[in-house]
């Protein structure tokens, strides 16, 4: 198995071309993935195969689409105040599937805390509340999405009081005790699962693309029955394979791991 996990941020909107708009980039990238004959599969399917030791049951190369932060642009067509109408990821996936007659799927990793999301929207989105949870259940029901866990509050500097014992923010490496990890991982998963029951809630994407040694070496592997998480993803570029560490899985982020369609083509072929 060679699994390439691609990550987009639907709120990365500084224009309306590939370089400045992750929604535009996603639409183009789906076409390229299809042209290369690489199937797009749910991330949970890849994780299940990895854990079961059944990676050989998947096609030789597969791709998975992930989205970070859970902005409304993932599911709702919106008008951006500076860049105009934007097709949501849902609309992009539907159009792609209809055009090619193949399934498309994405896992959106969302921030659980409603209060944290409100503060992030107020400070980072000109108070446009584009980071709600009203669409999570509908996203799962559409068959196009799983809703995964991106922590309780992202340890975002935009949140006045993050759930970290010393109030530290800006790096998920600060999560290095059971109490903090339990809230950021378990409580977040349980909130998401209550809002939108789905297989993706058992997947965790570390905020800022980084975990801590405590999470990777102790909390995730030793407390699985409590936190209910099956795998954790970083933002480190790379390819998943049968020997990958399930608590330190790679993802390739649009705008850093690749910046152009040609970059992505090389990444997919390597």
Walk through the language-model features, giving the residues of each.
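Aromatic- and glycine-enriched glycan-recognition loops and surfaces
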Residues: 20-32, 80-91, 126-134
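Generic hydrophobic/packing signal
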Residues: 4, 40, 93, 105-109, ...
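Single, functionally critical "micro-switch" positions that shape active/binding sites
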Residues: 67, 80, 149
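C-terminal active-site subregion of NodB/CE4 polysaccharide deacetylases
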Residues: 1-66, 71-77, 157-270
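A short alpha/beta connector and helix-capping loop motif
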Residues: 76-99, 103-109
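Acidic (Asp/Glu)-rich catalytic clusters
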Residues: 34, 54-57, 93-103, 128-149, ...
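Proline-centered loop/turn at the N-terminus of a beta-strand
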Residues: 62, 105-107, 146, 231
């Amino acid at each position: 198995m060679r699994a390439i996990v691609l990550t987009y941020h639907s709120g990365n909107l500084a224009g309306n071309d590939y370089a400045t708009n992750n929604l535009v980039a996603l639409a183009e990238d789906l076409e390229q993935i299809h042209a290369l004959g690489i199937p797009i599969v749910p991330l949970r399917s890849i994780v299940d195969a990895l854990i079961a030791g059944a990676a050989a049951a998947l096609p030789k190369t597969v791709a998975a689409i992930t989205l970070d932060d859970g902005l409304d642009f993932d599911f709702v067509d919106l008008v951006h105040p500076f860049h105009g109408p934007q097709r949501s990821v849902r609309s992009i996936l539907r159009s792609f599937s209809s055009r090619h007659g193949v399934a498309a799927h994405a896992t959106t990793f969302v921030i659980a805390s409603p209060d944290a999301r409100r503060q992030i929207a107020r400070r980072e989105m000109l108070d446009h509340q584009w980071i709600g949870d009203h669409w999570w259940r509908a996203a799962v029901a559409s068959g196009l999405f799983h809703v995964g866990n991106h922590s309780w509050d992202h340890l975002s500097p935009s949140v006045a009081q993050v759930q970290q014992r010393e109030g530290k923010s800006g790096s998920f490496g600060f999560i290095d005790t059971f109490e903090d990890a339990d809230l950021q991982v378990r409580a977040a998963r349980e909130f998401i699962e209550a809002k939108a029951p789905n297989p993706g809630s058992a997947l965790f994407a570390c905020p800022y693309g980084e975990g801590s040694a405590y999470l990777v070496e102790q909390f995730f592997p030793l407390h699985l029955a409590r936190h209910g998480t099956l795998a954790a993803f970083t933002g480190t570029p790379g390819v998943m394979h049968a020997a990958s560490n399930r608590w330190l899985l790679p993802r390739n982020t649009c705008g850093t791991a690749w910046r152009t369609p040609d970059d992505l083509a090389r990444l997919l072929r390597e």
